[in-house]
């Protein structure tokens, strides 16, 4: 019985791993782009954003979308108010801007069209050369995201 339990466990573990979105970091982007250039998806969110949590749950259920993102894009999840690391991106250095007990990262402000207070969640898609090709504020429903990413992949 114990062996059967172990075998079943080992069979199920890959299923959970295969359905997860692969996320990267800005620090790895330059190396990744040199070896295998792909468009880049930057997802900017905060941990207090309820829309962000709903969106994350809905996206995690769409295995086809996760597969598309993992195969054809580099995906960066960026927590705008908790990320305190210095980030070099597009030839510039961006830092965390503390403001009392909280703060925001300069990169979130730089990528947002609303420079005073970004809207969360924020989705930015860059081409292989890091040019902006799509910008989306607010919830990005899986069906709309799939259609947009298919359109971008066809470019």
Residue spans for each PLM region:
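A short, hydrophobic beta-strand/beta-hairpin element that forms part of a small beta-sheet core
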Residues: 106, 119-135
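Typically the conserved alpha-helix immediately C-terminal to a functionally engaged Cys/Sec
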Residues: 53-70
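Short active-site neighborhood of thiol/selenol oxidoreductases, capturing the structured segment around
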Residues: 35-50
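N-terminal leader/targeting and pre-domain segments
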Residues: 20-36
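Structural recognition of the beta-strand scaffold that forms the well-ordered cores
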Residues: 40-43, 75-78, 122-125
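Thiol-based oxidoreductase modules, predominantly thioredoxin-like and allied folds used
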Residues: 22-23, 66-102
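Bacterial Sec-dependent N-terminal signal peptides
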Residues: 1-22
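C-type cytochrome heme c attachment motif
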Residues: 47-54, 122
């Amino acid at each position: 019985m114990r062996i059967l339990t172990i075998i079943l466990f080992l069979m199920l573990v890959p299923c959970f791993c295969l359905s997860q979105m692969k996320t990267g970091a800005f620090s790895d982007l330059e190396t990744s782009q040199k070896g295998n250039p792909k468009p880049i998806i930057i997802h900017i969110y905060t941990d207090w954003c309820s829309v962000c949590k709903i969106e994350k749950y809905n996206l995690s259920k769409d295995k086809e979308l996760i597969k598309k993102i993992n195969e054809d894009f580099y995906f960066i999840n960026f927590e705008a108010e908790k990320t305190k690391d210095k980030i070099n991106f597009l030839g510039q250095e961006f830092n965390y801007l503390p403001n009392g007990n909280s703060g925001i990262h300069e990169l979130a402000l730089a990528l947002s069209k609303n420079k005073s207070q970004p809207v969360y969640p924020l989705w930015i898609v860059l081409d292989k050369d890091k040019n902006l090709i799509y910008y989306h504020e607010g919830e990005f429903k899986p069906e709309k995201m799939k259609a947009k990413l298919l359109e971008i992949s066809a470019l």
